[in-house]
Regions:
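Catalytic machinery of carbohydrate-active enzymes
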Residues: 1-362
Length: 362
């Protein structure tokens, strides 16, 4: 039944996307096609607004390559982020170049008053450039249209109705969702485009990394595993949701096979809640309530293995090799991004076959 529910939700999302596209076509015809330019003058931009009104952790982190690129191309510009991921301010507020995070509501009570308060805060500032970084977001188009901005940048497509001054055509080839916003900015500013150099970006302070290392060591000590010098620590997160989830029996077989290949490995399971049930009894386990804490702990590991979920994207911001396990979504669009990361489509593989592939990456 859970898989049936997830399948139904997937079809509903697809239906919403089709309706959103058709509505965009209607609005575009009513409003009329506008003339847009494709090239921005960096010398005219001192303030930037990025609008991504989406409550998911992964979609929020997919903005970080663009933020890094913007800061490199416009080092003196202040960047404001209009986001709706609930922990966005803590997660991204201290990034180089970012001045503030304007948080729009995602769920819960009093949505309209909270939305209007965030909108007033956004409209209190006049920006040189406002960016809608994704091609099909109705909320992004709305925020872009309501912002006080001299220039408005987004993607050009038939259903686009927002009041853009500058628009870039979608790339012909499929592009990872973490690369697409950076491509938009690089193209508009006339900068070199090297997609292989991009990665998710979440700078950590040394004290955060030290605390993460201590948390991992404490979790290992709690089960009496000990951590002899040279023993690699491999973390994993198994609690994905819906069709992305792999059952505990799958993880038990996977770890039995991987430890047979690498008996020196110390496994640590990262849990979504302190009371969550572990998938493999006897392993060290760790719950860290804040995303930056979780990221810092992952940054100290030899490898991190994750079903397609938010912690996979957090892990990909670190130097730790990250293995994403996919069975419901396209890793070409959503997989971990840096060069040492790897995505494995597991739907038609046994846990033992997946362990063999992870062993090669290890």
């Amino acid at each position: 039944m859970p898989r049936l529910g997830a399948l139904i939700r997937g079809h509903l999302r697809e239906l919403r996307g089709q309706l959103r596209y058709r509505l965009g076509l209607v609005l575009q015809r009513l409003i009329g096609r506008r003339h847009t330019a494709t090239r921005l003058d960096p010398g005219q931009i001192r303030s930037v607004l990025i609008a991504r009104i989406n409550g998911r952790l992964g979609n929020t982190l997919f903005l970080t390559p663009m933020i890094e690129r913007l800061h490199a191309l416009l080092p003196d510009a202040r960047i404001d982020l209009a986001l709706s991921y609930p922990h966005a301010a803590t997660l991204l507020g201290g990034m180089p170049g970012v001045r503030q995070v304007i948080l729009f509501p995602h769920k819960g009570r009093d949505l309209i008053p909270k939305y209007l308060r965030a909108l007033r805060r956004l409209r209190a500032t006049h920006y040189d450039l406002a960016i809608d970084p994704t091609p099909f977001s109705t909320s992004g188009r709305l925020i872009l249209s309501l912002a006080h901005a001299r220039f408005r940048l987004g993607f050009s497509l038939p259903s686009q109705w927002a009041a853009h001054t500058h628009a870039i055509p979608l790339p012909a080839a499929t592009m990872h969702q973490g690369r697409q916003p950076a491509y938009l900015v690089a193209t508009a500013l006339g900068a070199a485009w090297d997609p292989t150099a991009l990665r998710l970006w979440l700078p950590l302070r040394p004290d955060e990394v030290a605390a993460g290392r201590a948390a991992v060591a404490t979790a290992i000590d709690a089960v009496g595993a000990g951590l002899a010098p040279g023993r690699p620590v491999v973390g994993y997160f198994a609690h994905a949701t819906g069709l992305k989830r792999l059952p505990p029996a799958w993880w038990a077989r996977f770890w039995q096979a991987l430890l047979a290949l690498h008996p020196e490995v110390v496994a640590v399971e990262f849990l979504p809640a302190a009371a969550a049930a572990p998938t493999v009894p006897g392993f060290a386990r760790l719950h860290l309530p804040a995303q930056r804490q979780l990221t810092a702990a992952i940054s100290t590991l030899r490898m991190f293995i994750c079903a397609d979920a938010g912690p996979m994207h957090l892990a990909s911001t670190t130097d730790t090799p990250t293995v994403g396990l996919f069975q419901a979504t396209d890793p070409a669009l959503y997989g971990p991004l840096k060069a040492v990361d790897r995505s494995i489509a597991v739907a038609d593989l046994t846990p033992e076959a997946v362990a063999a592939q992870v062993s090669v990456a290890f």
